[in-house]
Amino acid sequence: MELLLVAIAGCTAMDVDAITVKRSEPARFDVTCSGNSTRSVNGNHITDIQVDFDVEFPDSEGGRAAADVLEIAIRKSHDRLCTVTRTVELPTPVGARLRGQ
């Protein structure tokens, strides 16, 4: 479970940073991802996945420009850029096979 949450956080953090850093380096950029491990008749899975951003930019023209695009960058990452999040949200079959058989 933890590895999937780290992958989501890392993927979306890279997207958001790539968009905002064009305007300013952040003074603080922390991203956390949480979820609930669930066991059901359908097997183990994660529910209620949440990505939280704690970002601060300097009080400068570039910092304000980066802050202005922050919400848009987060939305873009979630809606179409982050491959990990998109794969989790869109049902994607995963096959498993043993090589040589």
Model-assigned labels for residue ranges:
Residues 1-6, 16-101:
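Extended beta-strand/beta-hairpin segments
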